[in-house]
């Protein structure tokens, strides 16, 4: 750590959207954002779970627009930066400009781990706006560390000043994380930061985040009570407690985080965010974590096991954006019974 302060990036109000089918009320957003700001996290990501303009038939319709959520958070935040997520092909540079005008000052431009080349326009435009611009390589387990580093180098070349290893499937272990950060550090400029976005499907969200920091990672994503897709993200309050015991500087109020996780966020979960049969299958099969609730819906509709659908999706190497294939897979499984 060398005494540096970790950058704590909360994702409760973006990845956490998946856990409640994108149904946060504006009052939920204000309460959670204020609690995060009071506890002094560095950034608070706000958007539909699938990023700007993710509200759709394919991904699920949100209770509010991205701009309404961003404005609600920006109204109550005094210390943290408001962040948002943009997936090229879903969100556009026009959506990014609107998010900036609503109060977002950080953007994470997210692509599949082998498709960084589609992010050039969005990263360049974010830099023109003056935003803190992050490259976000989703499903990082699906390519080699060396290939991931090449993709990271592309994003850096477009203008991203921080590149994330993103374990969207919660499928990696500590060795996987170390290998990827070493590969990134070997090719990126010394001034380019790195970040870690973990999912907890194998119960390794905190351990993987710690491994990332030990390899020089600058920014850590986490969420209250792990609120996020699948078994959730690295639980913010747990990671901070572990970081504190390691003597790492994080600048946040652990007890305030613990209180907000249990008092504000956990009561909102209509399906517990935890490692269970279905979420473990996500991590074991290496499936995009936000497929969980779509798979459970399809399983109920077609009289199937959600685990069977998830495992088959893993075999077919489906990635984020292919939610429409969940029903196809379910129908194939039903017909092959």
UniProtKB/Swiss-Prot annotation:
Record-linked CDD domains: DRE_TIM_HOA (cd07943)
Catalysed transformations (reactions): (S)-4-hydroxy-2-oxopentanoate = acetaldehyde + pyruvate
UniProt xrefs under InterPro entries: 2-IPM_HCS-like (IPR050073), 4OH_2_O-val_aldolase (IPR017629), Aldolase_TIM (IPR013785), DmpG_comm (IPR012425), DRE_TIM_HOA (IPR035685), PYR_CT (IPR000891)
Gene Ontology terms describing biological process: 3-phenylpropionate catabolic process; L-leucine biosynthetic process
Keyword Translocase: no
Residues involved in Mn(2+) binding: 15, 197, 199
Pathway: Aromatic compound metabolism; 3-phenylpropanoate degradation
Active site: 18
Pyruvate carboxyltransferase domain location: 6-258
Residues reported in the UniProt entry to bind substrate: 14-15, 168, 197, 288
Key words, A-Z: Aromatic hydrocarbons catabolism, Lyase, Manganese, Metal-binding
Keyword match Glycosyltransferase: no
Residues at the site labelled Transition state stabilizer: 14
Record EC number: 4.1.3.39
Domain of life: Bacteria
Gene Ontology MF, one: 2-isopropylmalate synthase activity
Record function comment: Catalyzes the retro-aldol cleavage of 4-hydroxy-2-oxopentanoate to pyruvate and acetaldehyde. Is involved in the meta-cleavage pathway for the degradation of aromatic compounds.
Subunit note: Interacts with MhpF.
Family the UniProt entry places it in: Belongs to the 4-hydroxy-2-oxovalerate aldolase family.
Protein's name according to its UniProt entry: 4-hydroxy-2-oxovalerate aldolase
Organism: Shigella sonnei (strain Ss046)
Gene: mhpE
């Amino acid at each position: 750590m060398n005494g540096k302060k970790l950058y704590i990036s909360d994702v409760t109000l973006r990845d956490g959207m998946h856990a409640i089918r994108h149904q946060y009320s504006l009052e939920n957003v204000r309460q959670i954002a204020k609690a995060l700001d009071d506890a002094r996290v560095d950034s608070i990501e706000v958007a539909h779970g699938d990023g700007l303009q993710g509200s759709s038939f394919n991904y699920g319709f949100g209770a509010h627009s991205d701009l309404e959520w961003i404005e609600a958070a920006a109204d109550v935040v005094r210390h943290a930066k408001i962040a948002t997520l943009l997936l090229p092909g879903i969100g556009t540079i026009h959506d990014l400009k609107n998010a900036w005008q609503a109060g977002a000052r950080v953007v994470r431009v997210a692509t599949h781990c082998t498709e960084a080349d589609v992010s050039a326009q969005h990263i360049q435009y974010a830099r023109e706006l003056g935003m803190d611009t992050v490259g976000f390589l989703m499903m990082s387990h699906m390519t080699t560390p060396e290939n991931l580093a090449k993709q990271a180098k592309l994003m850096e070349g477009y203008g991203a000043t921080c590149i994330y290893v993103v374990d969207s499937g919660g499928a990696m272990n500590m060795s996987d994380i170390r290998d990827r950060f070493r590969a990134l550090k070997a090719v990126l400029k010394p001034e380019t930061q790195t970040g870690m976005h973990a999912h907890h499907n194998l119960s390794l969200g905190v351990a993987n985040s710690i491994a990332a920091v030990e390899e020089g990672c600058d920014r850590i994503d986490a969420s209250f009570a792990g609120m996020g897709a699948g078994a959730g993200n690295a639980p913010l309050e747990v990671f901070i407690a572990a970081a504190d015991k390691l003597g790492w500087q994080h600048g946040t109020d652990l007890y305030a985080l613990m209180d907000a996780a249990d008092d504000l966020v956990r009561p909102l979960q209509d399906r517990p965010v935890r490692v269970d049969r279905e979420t473990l299958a996500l991590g074991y099969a290496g499936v995009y974590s936000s497929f969980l609730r779509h798979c459970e819906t399809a399983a109920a509709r077609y009289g199937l096991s959600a685990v069977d659908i998830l495992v088959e999706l893993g075999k077919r190497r489906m990635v984020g954006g292919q939610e429409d294939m969940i029903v196809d897979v379910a129908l194939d499984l039903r017909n092959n019974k």
